[in-house]
Structures are given as structure tokens and as C-alpha cells.
Amino acid sequence: MRIGILTNEYPPNVYGGAGVHVEYLTRELAALDGGRNFVRVLAFGDQSERSPTLAVNGVQPPARIAAQDPRHSKLFDTLMQDLMMSGMATDLDIVHCHTWYSHFAGCLVKQLQNVPLVLTTHSLEPHRPWKVEQLGTAYHASSWLERTAYQNADGVVAVSAAMKNDVQAIYHVDPDRVRVIHNGIDLQQYRPRPDPGVLAQYGIRSDAPFVLFVGRITRQKGIIHLVNAIRHLRPGVQIVLCAGAPDTPEIAVEMTQAVERARAQSQHDIVWIQEMLPKDRVIALYTHAAIFVCPSVYEPFGIINLEAMACETPVVASSVGGIPEVVEHGETGLLVVPEAISATEVEPRNPEQFSRDLAAAVNVLLDDPELRQSMAEKARLRVERQFSWTSIARQTLGFYEDLIGAHSARRKA
């Protein structure tokens, strides 16, 4: 089978869960069945890679369009890159797109090459209204591109049952076209790896427990709510915020002000690492952390929780989207329910209460080392049993085979 993967994120340009998903899924697809399949990846960037079962080519915009609103530049770049992708994606049996950035290209390839189109739902634009801060009115264009792609897709991979429900509710996709295939984790890479040198490098004390956040500074990831929870945490705990890549200058300022307030209002040591760290250092932080916190207000799946659990770290997370399909409340962590404003306006109705509830859950685990240890062991076991990339790649390949078979039958009819 010749598989086309279209994506905006691919190593080394990975900054979110979608990029992690594409990296590992692609690798596993290329390795399945003794290399009988060939995977062609077209990604935003300048990547270049070739092996008998995998070819990766980066695509960059050939020119820049002078946009009246600078926030529109990303959309224009995306459309040019998608046009280039659609011309390069040839000799395929199926095309698989990840995030709205590649949807225009996927729709073109479906029509030009007469092959089935698959989309993976890493997120849905209607659930991310704050993106208008980053894209301006181009947010409405990205939403239109996404809606058009879902209307044209032969198959949709939902990374959680919650996402399947959202796809059906928002875009009215036939449930028979949607298959739930969870995200996964590299069990060899993500496992407990102590490294006291990493703690020393960032000024994290080894004689006191710390609570960890890892992620981008975005509305979606809810980091502001965690920062606002710090003053309610037990004395003596450190807070490590491994948080960089702010979506906009405005949220960068908001984050800085929130951290300054937290430092002024509490006696806690707050370590803010303002960059996205390489995997080995993040794994060391997971390993040494007492608790990992995921305060997302919108999370279709949440690979980040799998990473922490694989490193035997208990999780406190918001009970939104696909997170409850990963974190078992009371077994591998604790879930906190933020009451959303509405089905599409996912920010908490009462932000202060959400912050207090996060702190209360963290305090429960801080006060009970035996419970933390039990959850840590169960977390690793759950990940091993249910979230291996090999299994996920095989499920995805099976979906491809079903879609190609149905497409072939329609052509013969």
C-alpha cells in the first residue's frame, strides 16, 4: 500500500500532540508487515529523508503575500504550501491529513488522484474560538477549510470517543465513516529515567517535591488556571512550569503577569522554563515530578498525560474531551471537572473555582505518598496495556484497507 501523509508538523518541527502523533504513526506504518507498505510524508518545513519504506519531503511557501492584516500571513502560506503538496502527492492508494493546515491539499489530492481521503481529528476549530487572537478573521477561513474537508472525507479517525461525538455533532459526519483510534506512546523512550543533573540545571531542588506542567502557552492548555492555583497549594512544594511557545504576544504578557502574581502571593518556589525542551530532559522531569498537572480546557486526547503516566507519574487533569479515556479517576490520577460556559465556549464558567479545585486535587496527592506510588505503578501498567503505537498503526492500516476496498467497489459499480 502506498500511503500519503500530509501534515504541518513533522520532526524537527513538532510543537504539539498532532506532531507527536504523526511522527510515531508514520514510523510504525513504515515498519509494519516487513516493509510491505510505502509511506510518503509531505510536511511544512525543509525536511528530507528517504528509506525503502519512507520518504519525507518538506514544503515551504515559494513566496510571501503581503497581507493587510499580518495575522493572515499564516493562512496565505498554508494555502501555497498545500497547493505544492497536492502536486507532489502522486502514485498513492490513500491520503491521510492531519490538522486543518493540510486539509486543502487533502481535498485536492482526493479529486486529482481519485483516492480515498482520511482525516484525523486532533482538534476542531469551533472548539478553539481563542484562535481568532492568533489568526484574526483568517480563523473563519480555517474553520471553513476544516468543515469542507470533513464533508469530503471518506473516513475520519477520532483520537477519542469524545472526539467522535464532537465530529458528529458539529459536522454531521455519518458515524459509519468515523473510527475511534486512540493516540499512543513509545514505551521504550518514555519510561522512568532519573537524571538529577537536569534538576540542577534548572534550579529545581531535590529535597522537596515538585508539581510539573509541560506544554505550550495557549488558552487551550489552561496553564493560567494552574498558575492561579499555586497560592492554594500546600506549603513546601515546588512548581515547575515547562512552558514556552506562546500563541500570541498578548497571552505571553498574561502568563508573565500571572507568574509574577503567584510569586508575590505565595511562598512557593516557582521554576519557569520558558522553552520547549528536548525529550530526554522532559522525560527526566516527568520521572522526578511528584505530580503532573494537565489543566486543559479543551483536549481531544492529551498525549502529554500518556507521557507522564509512562514515566510513572500520577496525573491531576481536567475532565474534558478525551482525557477521561486516558486518566482513570482514583486509579492513575485525579480528574477535576471545569464547568464550561457552553458546548463551544469551553473556558471555565468560574475560573477561580476551577483553580481552587485543581489545587485541592493536587493537595490530596501531596498528602498521601502511598496513594501517589500506587497511582504511578497503575499508570505505567495502563499505558503498556492499551496505548502502544504498534497496535495503533495496525488499527489505522486496517481502516485504510477498508476505505480502499469500499472506494474500489464504488469505482467498479
List where the protein language model places each region.
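N-terminal subdomain of nucleotide-sugar transferases
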Residues: 1-49, 408-413
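A conserved mid-protein helix/loop that constitutes part of the nucleotide-sugar donor-binding site
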Residues: 20, 209, 213, 218-232, ...
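Nucleotide-sugar donor phosphate/pyrophosphate-binding loop at the beta->alpha transition
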Residues: 116, 127-148
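Carbohydrate-associated surface elements
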Residues: 162, 184
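Nucleotide-activated donor-binding/catalytic signature segment of Leloir-type glycosyltransferases, i.e.
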Residues: 252-280
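Short alpha-helical donor nucleotide-sugar binding micro-motif in glycosyltransferases
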Residues: 284-289
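Aromatic "clamp/platform" in nucleotide-sugar-dependent glycosyltransferases that forms part
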Residues: 297
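Short hydrophobic beta-strand element within catalytic cores of glycosyltransferases
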Residues: 314-317, 327, 334-335
